[in-house]
C-alpha cells in the first residue's frame, strides 16, 4: 500500500502539448494534508496514516473530534481519511506533520476515488442502459418500462440484484491509471489527465496507481 492525498476537485480544462495536441485535464486543489494519527501494528493491528484537510467551523465539530484534533495539535478539518502504509511510507511521518502536493510528480500514474454525481431515482433506460419498448403498435405507458422481472411459480420471486429502477449515482467510484500532467507545489495544484468522479468542489482521494 502507498499513502496518497485528499484534495478538492476544481473542474476541468485543457492543456496543449508542444505539438499542439489538446489534452483534457482535471485540476485538483491539494491543501496541506495534516497528519492526525499514525497507526502501528503493535497498538492498532495495522499500519496507517490518518489525515485531515481544509477547515471546519468549531460549531460543526463534535466533542470527540475536537479532542482528537487537539491531541494531534492540528486545526479541525472537514473530515478524516486514512491511508494504509508500510514501513517506508511511515519514515519521517509524525503526528502534526503535513503531506503536500509534491508527494506526486509529473508523469506519475494515479488512481482517483470520489463520490459520483447523484442522479436521484431513475428508470432502467437511464440507469442500466436498457432498450426502450415500442413507441406505438399497441404499447401504452410502458415505453421506458423494464418488462418482466421474474419467471413462474418456480422460483416464485424476483432475484436479488435484478436491474430495475432506483437510486442512481452518489456512489464511491475509483478511476484507475490516470496520468499526472503537472504538479504546482506552491499553489497546491495537481493537473490530472482525463475525468475524475464527482462534482466540482467535491473531495477526492488521489493515490499512486496500483497497476502502474
Curated annotation (Swiss-Prot):
One of its GO terms (cellular component) is cytosolic large ribosomal subunit. The modification N5-methylglutamine is found at residue 153. PROSITE patterns: RIBOSOMAL_L3. The keyword rRNA-binding applies. It comes from the Bacteria. SUPFAM superfamilies: Translation proteins. Residues 135-155 have a biased composition (Polar residues). Disulfide bonds: none annotated. Residues 135-162 are annotated as: Disordered. Keywords: Methylation, Ribonucleoprotein, Ribosomal protein, RNA-binding, rRNA-binding. One of its GO terms (biological process) is translation. Methylated by PrmB. GO terms for molecular function: rRNA binding; structural constituent of ribosome. Part of the 50S ribosomal subunit. Forms a cluster with proteins L14 and L19. NCBIfam families: L3_bact. Belongs to the universal ribosomal protein uL3 family. One of the primary rRNA binding proteins, it binds directly near the 3'-end of the 23S rRNA, where it nucleates assembly of the 50S subunit. This is Large ribosomal subunit protein uL3. It comes from Psychrobacter arcticus (strain DSM 17307 / VKM B-2377 / 273-4). The lineage of its organism: Bacteria, Pseudomonadati, Pseudomonadota, Gammaproteobacteria, Moraxellales.
Amino acid at each position: 500500500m502507498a499513502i496518497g492525498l485528499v484534495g478538492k476537485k476544481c473542474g476541468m480544462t485543457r492543456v496543449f502539448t508542444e505539438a499542439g495536441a489538446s489534452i483534457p485535464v482535471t485540476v485538483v486543489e491539494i491543501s496541506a494534508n495534516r497528519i492526525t494519527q499514525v497507526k502501528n501494528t503493535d497498538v492498532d493491528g495495522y499500519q496507517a496514516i490518518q489525515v485531515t484537510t481544509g477547515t471546519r467551523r468549531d460549531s460543526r465539530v463534535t466533542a470527540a473530534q475536537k479532542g482528537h484534533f487537539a491531541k494531534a495539535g492540528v486545526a479541525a478539518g472537514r473530515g478524516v481519511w486514512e491511508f494504509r502504509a508500510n514501513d517506508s511510507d511511515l519514515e519521517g511521518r509524525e503526528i502534526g506533520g503535513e503531506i503536500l502536493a509534491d508527494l506526486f510528480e509529473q508523469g506519475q500514474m494515479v488512481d482517483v476515488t470520489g463520490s459520483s454525481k447523484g442522479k436521484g431515482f431513475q428508470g432502467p433506460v437511464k440507469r442500466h442502459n436498457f432498450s426502450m419498448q415500442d413507441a406505438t403498435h399497441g404499447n401504452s405507458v410502458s415505453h421506458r418500462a423494464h418488462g418482466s422481472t421474474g419467471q413462474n411459480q418456480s422460483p416464485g420471486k424476483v432475484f436479488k440484484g435484478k436491474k430495475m429502477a432506483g437510486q442512481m449515482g452518489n456512489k464511491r467510484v475509483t478511476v484507475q491509471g490516470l496520468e499526472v500532467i503537472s504538479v504546482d507545489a506552491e499553489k497546491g495544484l495537481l493537473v490530472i489527465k482525463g475525468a475524475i468522479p464527482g462534482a466540482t468542489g467535491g473531495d477526492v482521494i488521489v493515490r499512486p496507481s496500483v497497476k502502474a
